[in-house]
């Protein structure tokens, strides 16, 4: 055959009837538009004209979409598909002719090239934003439309119709070209780039002008969106450089938390307005979420429907292909009467065409499916960000009583943030399945009926009858889930208390008691988890068993009830449909489970959002301007309006200009006035009543009174933290009579600086804690730190004031934390300063320095209004105004002179106490507590430095090793799956259960493969031999036995996996709790509380409920995938040839993905913890944040942390989509190669059907493998974190002596012998005590003192073996304490700590958690601690409720309870560590006498709060640099004028 365009027949070139009457010339005419476009566009593309014409140079390639962008891409893809069909049709038609006719397919080839060029050209024009170049495309579509229309008309005139494939293709192309032409006309209409005088200029998107935005999914073209092509750069670059936060940049504006918060808030407020009209109705969060995020969910659902409908192309194509192979096998295919013109029916019945259509259908299905996943994930992330913002906004408005009275705990808030928001996010991920699954099932049943007739209804009936069981199981799952969450919350609350009070628990040897309490709650939680695991197993079993039962019922019924034999095409198309039905049935339990969790989460969220809030404080934050008259009267300055919505931002450069203001007139000097005030915490009785006070402007007001009289509550009531039952708090619009306007122009006259009684610090640097968001002023900062005596402490820190002091300031002492909080209040340039008992944790020396330098000089020189709550009555002489409190009421108000005149008895009482305090001040020669704090700080810093140094050394060693290794080794380590962690998890469940799981899984999937192979043999036998009834009974019996075995094994495997996971969770939590409880105290000093708590909350939740179902799904899908590859290879061995390149491609995709995924996962983890800690910090420091009016600043910080975490998670999700799209496309390639190999080489239609069946489902299996493997890798991070704590070294609780060998009443005498004692805090640190030798006689009262870092506190800890005694020994009553079991030692000694700690429960539990004491003994202890009357007044007495942290008692009362706790034990040895620092002077003197009386015959070791308290001691131990330098009575030591003790006394006078 000669090669020519129109064929070798001369008549083919005949144009006598006109050029358009010749089909060849008409086809040639269709080449013109394509040649035109290629001729115009190629120079532009190659020369780069478009890119050089860009008016805006930015870093992203695609930043602009012309109108109709997505429609253009969709139409172009459709046109390319039609061109492929046209090429195929032309080649087939040409093969039926005697000579070659290039005109049949050459224009189609050129059209394909031109269409591809058009979209590339369009993409470049969008990139350059040069729309005038679109004119070439407009002309192209016009010419293509005209030429195709001419061709279609000629076909119509020739009598062709829809039955002719070429006519149909031409008609479709006319429509597509016309639509593309309309798109171009629309662009001209909107952009006006041609034919109009004023072209419309379009600015680039705002996000893409920001170089920090690198998440490009919303901005790239449709092809890149569908394939995540834009992610290639990030995925590949991860091999060269780890992905960091800079690499992923910021979120686009539409995805930021603040944007989505506004949407959700508006929707929720609308629901609140509707609910307000119906008293019994609560606002619906569900409707609010739908209003805010409903549209993207509908879009995702549309994608899901399209994907599900395309999924049914698989069974139909299998049926057609197997039917063609069967006809070929039986020789029944009709090949006679072939026409040169290919009909549509012939084309669609061709086996190869069906294979290609199946391939394209799979590509589209997987593209739509991944698009659906992405949209739901993006929407879920947006929802989570909005919910976090709503929760945080609510936290900032929470009523203080909710937290202090135990109605809402920190653990509950953490659960809302860490668990409930994630539950809702995951539910949104699965949401489209709720309405997609029913449609998928119905469509499957309809197609099954068309294939098998009424027998298909039997299988459908099985599904319908068993469906109610799924509902029953889902109901039980909801009940189990609810009880599990309740027990989990209770367990976390107890765990949180243990972690906060771990030092006290260890010193009192109570850790096992509290551990047992947690374990008891854990047992209850595990019982609920067992029920949850059982019903989860049944749900998984039903999902696996229902399809097998349905297939069995369908085929057995068809075998006996139908008159026709079961053909391979019917059988395997039906099996494919049943396999499609597996997915919705499998997801059903998962969706139901997450729906249940979401319902519970919404209930909790709704309760939280509707909880009580603080009252309106518009009097302090109102928008109104201040009265102008007062400003003009006193300052002569122009009036100013203050924006109350802005966070505190003060100008501090005028500090040195501040001068003392003139005292205002008596009638104008009231800053705050409370009239007839009555306040309460929550809905309880009034805490404060009959409050009528005034706070003078620019003066020092002191509030004094006994412990628990309501001093702190009064401050909080003024700040609006308490509920106002009656009366008013009036903040006067006072003037600012400042000589200098510059000094006060930025000071908010309602602004308050507040130092709470309970110190609160940020997890930030010292400088950031002091400045607290205000601009840094070096002179003011130095003045503040000097006034608070902080500079010596700062000098001890490794990085000075740039050192991060940790969450909640856990690496600082109480006094150091208190002084930083006071420094924060002093630094702020506010009108009013509230200081709540700032001296409580300070010794007298520091207190006096703070009073003189900080309050009297720094604050009063600046003439600021100061309200001071204190027990230090010696400072009353400095007060301009005094408020005396008693039993929640104001006892007296006025100046000291007024009170002297009006209440002589009160004045004389104060005078007595003040004289005592003055005497104590004169005697106090050293700041002993300060030295203790600084020594403790130095020790902690040494510990951290040593730890950091060791880590740095390890990292350097690793880096050196990495440098020595080649690149392949480095990449192997980065891509390594955490198999060791997986093995540890699996072995935690027990080797027997692990073996049973593996064996049952292998056996189950072998049986499933046997079922399908049996069916292939059965149908092939019928197809070839038309076997009779006897053989049919044989096949039915075998099929039934195999299906029954498969159903039984499904039950066994589901139960085994869940039980193994439950056992592993039980063991891991038990080991973690015991390891933490038994850990050394330095571990808690160097590890943030939030980090430890996260192991018990989020990580334990993952191990409990997420890993088992993921593990089951992973093993199932992996074995199914391996089974599929094996069966395809068996059916068509030639497939193995194609499997090699496909396997190589899959390997490299995985290789690149895993590195990037690991980096992104680490970013997600690392950005999640700061977010959780910020919520925890805010909840703990709520009163401080609100007092400073810094809510806006903290909100902004929360939004930044949320966006940072969300962008990491979004990139991680996009990377998963990147992977799945590629694995899906590889799966489609497997289907294509398997189909062509089956069509070409197989002679057995049953095996062809079997191979196609497994090839079709392998795409699902590959996706499940990848998704579950990725999920498991993420979830194993929780196991890895838990395991990292399990490797921690525990304290050595064992001793060489057996507890039974220790005398029952030891120590009875209280004799202490210290022999050559050497102590250190860690093995790599220097000793803090060196060769100490001392002897303490029974019953002696011993005082310990020394300079900073001298080691005196280390000795007290050495008595309890809280530090490492590496040499020497301590002998108590003849027994070396190093030989004693640790629990025995600590349980026989008593200690009173500086920081008071109470636990939730009862007063009885806090005094005697071991339940060893009688009520009389407990009442005696309370009476000694001056608490008996107060406890008797409480409901329940000894059984009265104590809330978490003892928040329903004042700090002083909590310390008194701690003293009573020590009295209950009545050990012969008592150690007092600054025990009276938080109580008033009168109570302290009483307690000192009580200690001397109650412990008169016992040994008392005191870490001196005042030197005066140990001068009269029986023995004084003086330490210097870890060495005991002096040991004698106080008076004797004072006789040695050159001695250290005397020197300390003299230098501090």
From Swiss-Prot:
Q: Where is the ABC transmembrane type-1 domain?
A: 297-597, 994-1274
Residue sites binding ATP 2 per the record = 1346-1353
Instruction: Give me the ranges of the annotated region Disordered.
Output: 944-967
* Entry's Gene Ontology molecular function annotations: ABC-type transporter activity; ATP binding; ATP hydrolysis activity; sulfonylurea receptor activity
Keywords from UniProt, A to Z, are:
ATP-binding, Glycoprotein, Membrane, Nucleotide-binding, Receptor, Repeat, Transmembrane, Transmembrane helix, Transport
One family name in Pfam for this protein: ABC_tran
InterPro entries recorded: AAA+_ATPase, ABC1_TM_dom, ABC1_TM_sf, ABC_transporter-like_ATP-bd, ABC_transporter-like_CS, ABC_transporter_C-like, ABCC8/9, ABCC9
Side of membrane Extracellular, spans: 1-30, 94-101, 154-167, 323-350, 445-455, 553-571, 1012-1034, 1149-1245
Superkingdom field: Eukaryota
- Enumerate the PANTHER family for this protein: ATP-BINDING CASSETTE SUB-FAMILY C (PTHR24223), ATP-BINDING CASSETTE SUB-FAMILY C MEMBER 9 (PTHR24223:SF173)
Q: How does it assemble?
A: Interacts with KCNJ11. Interacts with KCNJ8.
Identify this protein by name: ATP-binding cassette sub-family C member 9
Q: Which organism is it from?
A: Oryctolagus cuniculus (Rabbit)
Gene this chain is encoded by: ABCC9
């Amino acid at each position: 055959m000669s090669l020519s365009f129109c064929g070798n027949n001369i008549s083919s070139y005949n144009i006598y009837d006109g050029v358009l009457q010749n089909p060849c010339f008409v086809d040639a005419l269709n080449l013109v538009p394509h040649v035109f476009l290629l001729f115009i566009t190629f120079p532009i593309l190659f020369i780069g004209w478009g890119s050089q014409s860009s008016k805006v140079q930015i870093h992203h390639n695609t930043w602009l979409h012309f109108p109709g962008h997505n429609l253009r891409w969709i139409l172009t893809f459709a046109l390319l598909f039609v061109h492929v069909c046209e090429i195929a049709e032309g080649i087939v038609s040409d093969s039926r002719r005697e000579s070659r006719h290039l005109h049949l397919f050459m224009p189609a080839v050129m059209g394909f090239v031109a269409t591809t060029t058009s979209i590339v050209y369009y993409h470049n024009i969008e990139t350059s934003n040069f729309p005038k170049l679109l004119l070439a495309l407009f002309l192209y579509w016009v010419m293509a439309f005209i030429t195709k229309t001419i061709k279609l008309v000629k076909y119509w005139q020739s009598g062709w119709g829809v039955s002719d494939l070429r006519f149909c293709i031409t008609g479709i192309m006319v429509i597509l070209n016309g639509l593309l032409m309309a798109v171009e006309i629309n662009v001209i209409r909107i952009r006006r780039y041609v034919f109009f005088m004023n072209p419309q200029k379009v600015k680039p998107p705002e996000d893409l002008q920001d170089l920090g935005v690198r998440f490009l999914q919303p901005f790239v073209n449709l092809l890149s969106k569908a394939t995540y092509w834009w992610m290639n750069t990030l995925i590949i670059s991860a091999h060269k450089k780890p992905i960091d936060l800079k690499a992923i940049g910021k979120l686009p504006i539409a995805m930021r938390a603040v944007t989505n918060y506004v949407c959700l808030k508006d929707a929720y407020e609308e629901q609140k307005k509707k609910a307000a009209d119906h008293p019994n109705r609560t606002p619906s969060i569900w409707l609010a979420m739908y209003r805010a995020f409903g549209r993207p969910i509908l879009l995702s659902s549309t994608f899901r429907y399209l994907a599900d409908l395309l999924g049914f192309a698989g069974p139909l194509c299998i049926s057609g292909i197997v039917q063609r192979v069967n006809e070929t096998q039986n020789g029944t295919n009709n090949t006679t009467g072939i026409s040169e013109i290919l009909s549509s029916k012939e084309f669609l019945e061709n086996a190869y065409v069906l294979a290609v259509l199946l391939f394209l259908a799979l590509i589209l299905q997987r593209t739509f499916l991944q698009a659906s996943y992405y949209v739901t994930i993006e929407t879920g992330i947006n929802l989570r960000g909005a919910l976090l913002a709503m929760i945080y906004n609510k936290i900032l408005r929470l009523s203080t009583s909710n937290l202090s009275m135990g109605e809402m705990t920190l653990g509950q808030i953490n659960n809302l943030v860490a668990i409930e928001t994630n539950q809702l996010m995951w539910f949104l991920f699965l949401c489209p399945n709720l309405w997609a699954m029913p449609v998928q099932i119905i469509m499957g049943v309809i197609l099954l009926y068309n294939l098998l007739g009424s027998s298909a209804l039997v299988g459908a009936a099985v599904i319908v009858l068993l469906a109610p069981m799924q509902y029953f199981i889902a109901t039980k799952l909801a009940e189990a889930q609810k009880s599990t969450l309740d027990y989990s919350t209770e367990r976390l609350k107890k765990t949180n208390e243990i972690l906060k009070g771990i030092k006290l628990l260890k010193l009192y040897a109570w850790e096992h008691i509290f551990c047992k309490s947690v374990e008891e709650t854990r047992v209850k939680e595990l019982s609920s988890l067992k029920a949850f695991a059982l019903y989860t197993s049944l749900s998984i079993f039903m999902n696996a068993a229902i399809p097998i039962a349905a297939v069995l019922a369908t085929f057995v019924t068809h075998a006996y009830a139908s008159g026709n034999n079961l053909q391979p095409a019917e059988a395997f198309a039906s099996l494919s449909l049943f396999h499609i039905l597996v997915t919705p049935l499998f997801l059903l339990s998962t969706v139901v489970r997450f729906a249940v969790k979401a319902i519970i989460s919404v209930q909790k969220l709704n309760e939280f959002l509707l909880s009580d809030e603080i009252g309106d404080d518009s009097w302090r934050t109102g928008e109104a301007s201040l009265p102008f008259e007062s400003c003009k009267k006193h300052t002569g300055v122009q009036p100013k309006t203050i924006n109350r919505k802005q966070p505190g931002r003060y100008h501090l450069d005028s500090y040195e200009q501040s001068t003392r203001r003139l005292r205002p007139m008596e009638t104008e000097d009231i800053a705050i006035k409370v009239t007839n005030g009555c306040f309460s915490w929550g809905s309880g009785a009034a805490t404060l009543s009959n409050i009528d006070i005034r706070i003078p402007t620019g003066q020092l007001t002191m509030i004094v009174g006994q412990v628990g009289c309501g001093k702190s509550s009064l401050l909080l009531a003024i700040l609006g933290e308490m509920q106002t039952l009656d009366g008013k708090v009036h903040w006067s619009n006072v003037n600012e009579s400042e000589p200098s306007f510059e000094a006060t122009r930025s000071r908010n006259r309602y602004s308050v600086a507040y130092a709470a009684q309970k110190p609160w610090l940020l997890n930030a640097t010292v400088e950031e804690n002091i400045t607290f968001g205000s601009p840094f002023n070096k002179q003011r900062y130095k003045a503040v730190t000097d006034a608070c005596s902080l500079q010596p402490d700062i000098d001890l820190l490794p990085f000075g004031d740039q050192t991060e002091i940790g969450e909640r300031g856990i690496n600082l002492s109480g006094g150091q934390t208190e002084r930083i909080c006071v420094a924060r209040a002093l630094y702020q340039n506010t009108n009013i300063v509230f200081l709540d008992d700032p001296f409580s944790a300070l010794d007298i020396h520091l207190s006096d320095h703070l009073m003189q330098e900080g309050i009297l000089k720094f604050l009063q020189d600046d003439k600021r209004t100061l309200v001071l709550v204190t027990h230090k009555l010696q400072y009353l002489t400095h007060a301009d105004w005094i408020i005396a409190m008693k039993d929640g009421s104001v006892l007296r108000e006025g100046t000291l002179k007024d009170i002297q005149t009006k209440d002589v008895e009160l004045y004389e009482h104060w005078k007595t106490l003040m004289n005592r305090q003055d005497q104590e001040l004169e005697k106090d020669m050293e700041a002993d507590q300060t030295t203790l704090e600084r020594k403790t700080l130095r020790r902690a810093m040494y510990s951290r430095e040593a730890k950091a140094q060791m880590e740095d050394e390890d990292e350097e060693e690793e880096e050196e090793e990495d440098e020595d290794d080649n690149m392949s080794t480095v990449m192997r380590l980065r891509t390594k799956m955490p198999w060791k962690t997986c093995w540890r998890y699996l072995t935690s469940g027990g080797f027997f259960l692990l073996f049973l799981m593996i064996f049952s899984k292998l056996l189950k999937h072998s049986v499933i493969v046997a079922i399908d192979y049996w069916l292939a043999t059965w149908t092939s036998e019928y197809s070839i031999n038309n076997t009779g009834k006897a053989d049919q009974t044989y096949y039915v019996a075998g099929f039934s036995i195999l299906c029954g075995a498969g159903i039984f094994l499904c039950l066994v495997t589901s139960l085994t996996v869940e039980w193994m996971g439950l056992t592993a969770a039980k063991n891991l939590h038990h080991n973690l709790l015991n390891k933490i409880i038994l850990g050394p105290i330095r571990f808690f000093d160097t590890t943030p509380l939030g980090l430890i708590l996260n192991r018990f909350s989020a990580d334990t939740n993952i191990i409990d409920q997420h890993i088992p179902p993921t593990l089951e799904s992973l093993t199932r899908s992996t074995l199914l995938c391996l089974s599929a590859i094996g069966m395809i290879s068996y059916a068509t061995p030639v497939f193995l040839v194609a499997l090699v390149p496909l396997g190589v491609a899959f390997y490299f995709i995985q290789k690149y993905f895993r590195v990037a995924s690991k980096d992104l996962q680490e970013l997600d983890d690392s950005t999640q913890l700061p977010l959780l800690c910020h919520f925890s910090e805010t909840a703990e420091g709520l009163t401080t944040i609100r007092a400073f009016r810094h809510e806006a600043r903290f909100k902004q910080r929360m939004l930044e942390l949320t966006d940072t975490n969300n962008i990491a998670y979004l990139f991680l999700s996009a990377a998963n989509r990147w992977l799945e799209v590629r694995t899906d496309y590889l799966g489609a390639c497997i289907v294509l190669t398997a189909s062509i190999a089956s069509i070409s080489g197989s002679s057995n239609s049953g095996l062809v059907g079997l191979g196609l069946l497994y090839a079709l489902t392998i795409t699902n299996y590959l996706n499940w493998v990848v998704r579950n493997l990725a999920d498991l890798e993420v979830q194993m991070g929780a196991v890895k974190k838990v395991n990292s704590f399990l490797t921690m070294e525990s304290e050595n609780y064992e001793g060489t002596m057996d507890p039974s060998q220790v005398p029952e009443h030891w120590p009875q005498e209280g004799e202490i012998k210290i022999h050559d004692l050497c102590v250190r805090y860690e093995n790599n640190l220097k000793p803090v005590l060196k060769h100490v030798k001392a002897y303490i006689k029974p019953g002696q009262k011993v005082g310990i003192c020394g300079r900073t870092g001298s080691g005196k506190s280390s000795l007290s800890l050495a008595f309890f073996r809280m530090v490492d005694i590496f040499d020497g020994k301590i002998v108590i009553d003849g027994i070396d304490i190093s030989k004693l079991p640790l629990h025995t030692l600590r349980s026989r000694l008593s200690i009173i700590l500086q920081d008071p700690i109470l636990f939730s429960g009862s007063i009885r539990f806090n005094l005697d958690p071991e339940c060893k004491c009688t009520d009389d003994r407990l009442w005696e202890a309370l009476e000694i601690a001056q608490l008996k009357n107060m406890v008797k007044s409480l409901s329940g007495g000894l059984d009265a409720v104590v809330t978490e942290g003892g928040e329903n008692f004042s700090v002083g009362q909590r310390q008194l309870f701690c003293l009573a706790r020590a009295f209950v034990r009545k050990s012969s040895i008592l150690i007092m560590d600054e025990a009276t620092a938080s109580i008033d002077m009168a109570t302290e003197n009483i307690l000192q006498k009580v200690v001397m009386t109650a412990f008169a015959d016992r040994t008392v070791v005191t870490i001196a709060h005042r030197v005066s308290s140990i001068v009269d001691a029986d023995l004084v131990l003086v330490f210097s640099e870890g060495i005991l330098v002096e040991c004698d009575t106080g008076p004797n030591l004072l006789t040695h004028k050159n001695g250290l003790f005397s020197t300390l006394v003299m230098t501090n006078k």
